[in-house]
UniProtKB/Swiss-Prot annotation:
GO terms for cellular component: plasma membrane. Belongs to the UPF0391 family. It is found in: Cell membrane. It comes from the Bacteria. The keyword Cell cycle does not apply. It comes from Coxiella burnetii (strain RSA 331 / Henzerling II). Keywords: Cell membrane, Membrane, Transmembrane, Transmembrane helix. The chain crosses the membrane at residues 3-23, 30-50. It is a multi-pass membrane protein. Disulfide bonds: none annotated. Pfam families: DUF1328. This is UPF0391 membrane protein COXBURSA331_A2131.
Amino acid sequence: MLFWVLIFFIIAVIAALFGFTGIAAASAGIAKILFFIFLVLFVISLIAMLVRGRRPKL
C-alpha cells in the first residue's frame, strides 16, 4: 500500500511542478489538491506502517 501511495505522490508532485510553473496554468488547482491528498495518504500509510511494526514491501 505504501508503494502505491509513493507512486501517486510522485505523480502529484510532477503535476504540481507543471501547474506551479505555468506550463499548465489551468490545472494548477487540480495539482494542488492532488498534492495535498496524496501527502495526507502518504503520512497515514507511514503512520500505519510504524504502528504495525512491519517493513514496507518495495
